[in-house]
Amino acid sequence: MDAEALRNLYLSSILPNESKTGNESPEKKFSSPVLLQRAKVIPLRLEYEERKLLHLLTAALDVSDYTDSVDTLSFSSPAKRLAQQLKGITAVLSGIMVAYDYKVGQELLEHKNFEQHAEFFKKIFEIGRRYKVLNPNRLGSTYGKLMYFVQDSMRPEIQDALGFNLFKPILTVYEFLNERDALNALEDPYAEIATMEIVAENRSRSAIQKDIKAKERAVEHIAKKYYSSKITKEKVRWCLYSIADSNSYLRYNRDPIAKLIGLVEAYFSPDTVDDEFTLAIDAINGSRLKHSHYKQYHYVVQSLHLWLLIMGEIFSLWALSDLELTNPDMEYKLIDNNQGIHRMQPCPNIRIAMERILRTAQEQSETWIGSSTIHLGDTAVPNALLFIDKYMQVPRILTPLVLLFKELDSLNDHSLLNYIDTAFGGREYLKKTILTDFMRFGFDGSGADNWFDAGSCIDGRLTSAWNWANNIHTKDYYRVLLMSGFLSFNGE
């Protein structure tokens, strides 16, 4: 499938406005025709042999200094940087092959016949990219090196030298089933049950067991009905399990946002102002916005609803990000944006997707507060990799907050409760204090080096929240967070 076909496929996976409310459960989002649509961007779960190749890839990239050596402004000419890129890529490919098959690796080192092993190298880099999508907290900086390797391999000069590039589309459930004429398995009436996530929270053991058995029966029904000479029962099950994985992924990303919206609506009203817990902010002390209590309340709630919609489309955004970074027609240039050297590259397809999502959020709001500017391919968000990384911070910031409130509700440590009563006037008072602080200073337009990159733009809303998270250690309630089990906002 060529790049244009992939682009259209990925963009078509984003649900039309009438299908979205932003509040449905992951299971409901994956009902019948929607399931088929979403499968276009859901990665297939890695198999055992693929995991062994993944370990090989990550080990090779971990010891590579590729990005440090090529992403620097010190090269005197493009030709010298190109030579360094080619040297770095061939070194890693050689290392991977030597570790995988010593004899073949020695031949590769001697004859430099990389093209003979093109499919192997494409496969191993596809495995790494596919794994990252379903495991965003894994790989760390290794993923950046991985993507920049693939990106640089798309350059005509490097393709000519190697005889191939490292890009292979991420293997999705849709593509896997489509190649085996088994897409109708996702239209089966039992598909929703077979792919649902079973959540144990606040449920009885008998109810959980009932769901487990119903899910197992549904999986077996579909596997028996749709297997053929082209696809085994086990492969059908594997596809269903992959979709179930994606349901868990969505719940992890979306639930903290939905729960925080519920907390905000429970503790605050836009029309009632408590002087002690007012949300009003002025453009002073780092803040770049000036909002009344009413305006700030709606600004925060709208931002949270926007993030909820973005997290609901995160698989589509991941797929488009992968496509943007490896697009040879969109050249990047190295820039220094005062946060290090970055590759700045246009992101037209992600922009289309984000504009659709933003339009949905605006249609769900009576009045949109703040800017509608989307930073992409500029100094604020230089490329698709940093775009995805930025929005994956949302659950990392909000999950510890939601868990803290849950921990406070169940807290029975008398010493800690006495401290909370003495220092903060009780646990409910403390919860409202933390929420007020988050809603005021996590959405005040702060956190960037200049007015253009901050403020109320779509990107700036998240910049402010991350700035608040980075300064959490300065808050009066920080020690309570630590005593309640809080560690950090880094996703661990």
From Swiss-Prot:
Keyword flag Nucleus: yes
GO (cellular component) term, any one: cytosol
Compartment(s) where it occurs, according to its Swiss-Prot or TrEMBL record: Cytoplasm; Nucleus
Protein's UniProt keywords contain Transmembrane: no
Major localization class: cytoplasm
Homology family: Belongs to the UPF0652 family.
Protein name per its UniProtKB record: UPF0652 protein C22H10.08
Organism classification: Eukaryota, Fungi, Dikarya, Ascomycota, Taphrinomycotina
